[in-house]
Amino acid sequence: MKSVGLEEMMEAGVHFGHQTRGWNPKMSSYIYGNRNGIHLIDLVQTARLLSEACDFLFNAAKEGKEFLFVGTKSQASDIIASEALRAESHYVNQRWLGGMLTNWSTIKTRIRKLKDLEQKEKNGILDTLPKKEAAVLKRQLYKLRKYLSGLQDMKYLPDVVIIVDQKREINAVKECIKLGIPTISLVDTNCDPTLADLPIPANDDAIRSINLLVSKLADAIYEGQRVK
């Protein structure tokens, strides 16, 4: 696996944290200074921890483990979906519904409903129903597809969860902790790195930063899956 260079990370703005007044003191060991009231992340540590996370994912993928990518903010949404699909993994990129993992049996029922409605749509059955009934089912289909399409092929709880924006996805983080599912999280200067099994200190707001790091994590999974 090709490692990420410090210059490449700087160009992507990985080192830019949040305003100093909004920091989490638990991130102090990953911060090397500040500029104009913005904390700057130590990219040497980012590179090291990204490499550790990639090694972990590569080995897990080699063993046939399942992965879930989570990132619902607008800057991350498209990246999460495309990189998860490339890594033959699952994703949540619109909204974390409470109990997505801790109440998996209920979510599985909703996924079955989604598949059933998609089949009915494909076969043209929805168009043969009375107008009101068809409208209700089409609304259901739209909503289920929006929130659950990235989980359609997930038969069991994931073995590893990759998270962009720990603060925003705190409910996902808590569910993983409760179930003992390891997490890899991009942690900005306002996050708590102790909540992640493998934290990666990084700018979790800039599209280029998110894209660079998530694509590297997906690369590790992709390569691990192809080891004979």
UniProtKB/Swiss-Prot annotation:
CDD domains: RPS2 (cd01425). Keywords: Chloroplast, Plastid, Ribonucleoprotein, Ribosomal protein. Its main location: plastid. It comes from the Eukaryota. It is found in: Plastid, Chloroplast. Pfam families: Ribosomal_S2. One of its GO terms (molecular function) is structural constituent of ribosome. InterPro entries: Ribosomal_uS2, Ribosomal_uS2_bac/mit/plastid, Ribosomal_uS2_CS, Ribosomal_uS2_flav_dom_sf. GO terms for cellular component: chloroplast; mitochondrial small ribosomal subunit. One of its GO terms (biological process) is translation. The keyword Plastid applies. SUPFAM superfamilies: Ribosomal protein S2. Belongs to the universal ribosomal protein uS2 family. This is Small ribosomal subunit protein uS2c.
